[in-house]
């Protein structure tokens, strides 16, 4: 039941997000060709839709603004990375998709610039995690991105773990099904099965 609820929630959330378009007016003085001039003007942008390019021409945000901050719905790109989704007070907040340079992708809930809540993380190598996240910074190395709560991790080799996670590791009740059919079920601690279900 947990698994079905998780999939239904994620589908509805991202279907609604995909339909989001700004109804706000264009920000006054929007000129992507003049980043310095634009930077000065963004401080005054509020309740409008515009594009901001940083002084180095590397970071681009196109979307809704409120009191000079990205706020509402917008797209952020930086050195090959891209975030599309909701913002609040200059940080990713709500539903959003973050694509990494290496091809990894996170689609899910955000809170104050971090993965927080339900989300799907697809790795460039084909692995996939669907489940809960807690206070995870998007710019941390993979081994520090914290899967927390209940989730399903499917490995590209056919292995699969369904169960509880803590700080990115299998921790709590869970079932690990190997590609060869072997099943390990019981209580896990820091990725190790410590109590097998008989």
Each predicted region: which residue ranges?
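Sec-dependent N-terminal signal peptides
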Residues: 4-14
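Glycine/tyrosine- and acidic-biased, solvent-exposed loop/turn segments at the edges of beta-strands
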Residues: 16-198
